[in-house]
């Protein structure tokens, strides 16, 4: 009974503190001392409203605008974001460039990897408007980031480079935004370049997307030319979000990241109701409940507020913090405790599928634990990476990592090296294969070592299917022949060829994913002198003739470098493997034979000759029988050594062999 009374009293006192904070008045110190620890921490953390918060509080939902910038990679999204932040006074002019590119790898490569958000206040015709901007990635590997960003937006700036024109990912991003009902504002960037051709690009946009050329805004994000005319276009053309403050809280989780002090921080879009520090909310996906510790907006960094209201996008973290990132399921719906039956949860987002797999091993097994911690920290902020432990006889304990594409994999590797100082060995990328067994069951195999050898496959496997993608390539017509030849040599199947202007072509090919990850984009850029662009989407699994290629050293397979590939590639890859591996293996006291084998068929072979001891040095030249006897004895000794001796291959040899 006493414990029940104590609990009820604690809840009542917490409610009192919460109520006083709602009324905007700080509590007296004597009252603070009588509160329980948790309620006291909320009350002491109270700060009076600042100037920014007062301005936001006076803006009705009808004057909110949530929008994103979408474009092909390197068309100037992040630079344009900087100009908009400067125009609204959110950041100082001429300060930190690419302010929404927060990762070192983003600044180094000049690309956006994670969608970043920022709120701005813009005064238009005497009224304040709350603008919420999302800077999205342009590369196809991060399409899931773009798709999630659209859920928090009512419109988008469709940005096109005035010199390059409509590119493959411009097309893909347009249809993705159009399918989600976003209002699109066409924007031409880099109009100040000498080779910019706005009339041609406007014609492309009209022919490809049926967008009105008169509605386009022509700007130069680098110099700031005409950028000021973009904000009125956002206010006038992009609709305000729909929401009801009087309804129970309905909040969508758009993204999350990990903070070592606060735990998991959630980026949320509030559709109905409002949320404040001290509220208890529940997740529909997990059923877990949390006490809100802090709410705020990104301005451009985390800026605490006393409330997040319907129509706003902001961040939230809990007290005590959410320590397991697995609890934060992107696409989840949250509501206040007790309102679960009054709120309809959102359907959530489709989980992105890993399309490329690599194995990762530490260069020194003593660093295994440190590397494991580093990988886990990065995967907390990038939920699209899949992780599974594995081990290799040659390279020791490691992990099988799944990525959305080769750039995603490369960025992850760079972050490991730059942010955590990790030294790692990464195997060449592989793709998942679907195996249909003779008993009718199916398996998706992502690890080449688990793929059945040709001898087993003959008895156990009925069919093997490999993943295909539909590649959309935009290019000038003068390179059409070279690109068709490249696609055909990579087992591509032509689906569509369209001239969307007199000199620009859109090609659509179904291409095996295994060829796409094998530097197809680099070859495409080489064939077109950098003028082609590429976008792709999943095209399902197609039946194919697939075998496993093993590298053998003195008859023993080296598991770390097994590969699954099409039969047409076996001879070429096998010969290249043997020649490359031979260079990195040191000579032994016995003969070392390196072979590439597909099942029992030896595709290629190389021999490393042993060190030779001169057993005839002390013999007289005429002693032929003794000479023959010593040579025979040496030959027998080598056979015995080869039978019982194991080839010592240094870790560095694997590192050099697996290097690109």
Curated annotation (Swiss-Prot):
Which reactions is this enzyme annotated as catalysing? GTP + H2O = GDP + phosphate + H(+)
Q: How does it sit in the membrane?
A: Peripheral membrane protein
Q: Does the keyword GTP-binding apply?
A: yes
Q: Where is this protein localized, as stated in its record?
A: Mitochondrion inner membrane
Entries under InterPro entries matching the protein: EF-4, EFG_III/V, EFG_V-like, EFTu-like_2, G_TR_CS, LepA_C_sf, LepA_CTD, LepA_IV
**Broad class of the protein's primary localization:** mitochondrion
A GO BP entry is: translation
Q: Which UniProt keywords apply?
A: GTP-binding, Hydrolase, Membrane, Mitochondrion, Mitochondrion inner membrane, Nucleotide-binding, Protein biosynthesis, Transit peptide
UniProt cross-references to Pfam families, sorted A to Z:
EFG_C, GTP_EFTU, GTP_EFTU_D2, LepA_C
Asked if the Swiss-Prot or TrEMBL record annotates the protein with the keyword Hydrolase, the reply is yes
Q: Where are the transmembrane segments?
A: none
What cellular component terms from Gene Ontology apply here?
mitochondrial inner membrane; mitochondrial matrix; mitochondrion
Q: Which domain of life is it from?
A: Eukaryota
Q: Where is the transit peptide?
A: 1-42
Residue ranges constituting the tr-type G domain according to the UniProt record: 62-242
Name the positions where GTP binds.
71-78, 135-139, 189-192
Q: Which GO terms describe its molecular function?
A: GTP binding; GTPase activity; mitochondrial ribosome binding
Enzyme Commission number, as recorded: 3.6.5.-
Tell me the function of this protein: Promotes mitochondrial protein synthesis. May act as a fidelity factor of the translation reaction, by catalyzing a one-codon backward translocation of tRNAs on improperly translocated ribosomes. Binds to mitochondrial ribosomes in a GTP-dependent manner.
Q: Which family does it belong to?
A: Belongs to the TRAFAC class translation factor GTPase superfamily. Classic translation factor GTPase family. LepA subfamily.
Q: Return the protein name.
A: Translation factor GUF1, mitochondrial
| Species name | Phaeosphaeria nodorum (strain SN15 / ATCC MYA-4574 / FGSC 10173) (Glume blotch fungus)
The primary gene name is GUF1
């Amino acid at each position: 009974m006493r414990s029940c009374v104590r609990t009820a009293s604690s809840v009542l006192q917490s409610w009192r503190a919460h109520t006083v904070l709602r009324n905007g008045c700080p509590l007296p110190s004597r009252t603070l001392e009588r509160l329980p620890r948790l309620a006291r921490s909320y009350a002491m953390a109270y700060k009076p409203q600042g100037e920014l918060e007062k301005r936001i509080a006076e803006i009705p939902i009808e004057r909110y605008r949530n929008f994103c910038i979408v474009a092909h990679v390197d068309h100037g999204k992040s630079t344009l974001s900087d100009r908009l932040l400067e125009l609204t006074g959110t950041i100082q002019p001429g300060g930190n460039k690419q302010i929404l590119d927060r990762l070192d790898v983003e600044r180094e490569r000049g690309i956006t990897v994670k969608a970043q958000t920022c709120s701005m206040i813009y005064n238009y015709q005497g009224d304040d408007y709350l603008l919420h901007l999302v800077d999205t990635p342009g590369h196809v590997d991060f399409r899931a980031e773009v798709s999630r960003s659209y859920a928090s937006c009512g419109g988008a700036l469709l940005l096109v480079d005035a010199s390059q024109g409509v590119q493959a990912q411009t097309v893909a991003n347009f249809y993705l935004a159009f399918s989600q009902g976003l209002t699109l504002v066409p924007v031409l960037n880099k109009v100040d370049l000498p080779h910019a051709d706005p009339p041609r690009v406007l014609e492309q946009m009209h022919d490809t997307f049926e967008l009105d050329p008169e509605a386009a805004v022509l700007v130069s994000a680098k110099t700031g030319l005409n950028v000021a005319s973009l904000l009125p276009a956002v206010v006038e053309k992009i609709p305000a979000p729909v929401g009801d403050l009087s309804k129970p809280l309905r909040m969508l989780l758009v993204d999350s990241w990990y903070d070592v002090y606060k735990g998991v921080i959630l980026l949320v879009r509030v559709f109905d109701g409002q949320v404040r520090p001290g509220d208890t909310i529940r997740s529909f996906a997990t059923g877990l409940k949390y006490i809100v510790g802090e709410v705020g907006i990104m301005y451009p960094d985390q800026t605490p507020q006393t409330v997040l209201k319907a129509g706003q996008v902001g961040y939230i973290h809990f007290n005590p913090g959410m320590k397991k990132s697995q609890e934060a399921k992107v696409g989840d719906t949250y509501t206040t405790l007790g309102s679960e039956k009054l709120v309809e949860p959102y359907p959530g987002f489709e989980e992105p599928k890993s399309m490329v797999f690599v194995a990762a091993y530490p260069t020194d097994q003593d660093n295994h634990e440190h590397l494991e911690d580093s990988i886990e920290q990065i995967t907390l902020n990038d939920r699209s990476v899949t992780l599974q432990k594995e081990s290799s006889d040659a390279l020791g304990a490691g992990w099988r990592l799944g990525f959305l594409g080769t750039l995603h994999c490369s960025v992850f590797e760079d972050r490991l090296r730059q942010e955590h100082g990790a030294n790692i060995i990464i195997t060449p990328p592989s793709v998942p294969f679907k195996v249909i067994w003779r008993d009718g069951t199916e398996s998706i195999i992502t690890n080449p070592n688990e793929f059945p050898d040709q001898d087993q496959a003959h008895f156990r496997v009925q069919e093997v299917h490999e993943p295909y993608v539909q590649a959309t390539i935009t290019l000038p017509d003068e390179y059409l022949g070279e690109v068709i030849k490249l696609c055909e040599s990579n087992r591509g199947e032509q689906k569509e060829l369209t001239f969307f202007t007199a000199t620009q072509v859109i090609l659509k090919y179904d291409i095996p994913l295994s060829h796409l990850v094998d530097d197809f984009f680099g070859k495409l850029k080489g064939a077109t002198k950098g003028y082609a662009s590429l976008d792709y989407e999943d095209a399902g699994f197609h039946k194919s003739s697939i075998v496993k290629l093993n590298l053998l050293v003195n008859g023993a397979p080296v598991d770390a470098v097994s590969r699954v590939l099409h039969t047409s590639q076996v001879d070429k890859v096998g010969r290249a493997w043997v020649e490359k591996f031979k260079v990195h293996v040191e000579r032994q006291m016995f003969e070392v034979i390196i072979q590439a084998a597909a099942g029992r068929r030896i595709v290629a072979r190389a021999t490393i000759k042993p060190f030779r001891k001169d057993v005839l040095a002390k013999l007289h030249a005429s002693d032929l029988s003794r000479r023959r006897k010593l040579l025979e004895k040496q030959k027998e000794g080598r056979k015995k050594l080869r039978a019982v001796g194991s080839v010592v291959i240094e870790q560095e040899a694997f590192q050099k062999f697996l290097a690109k």
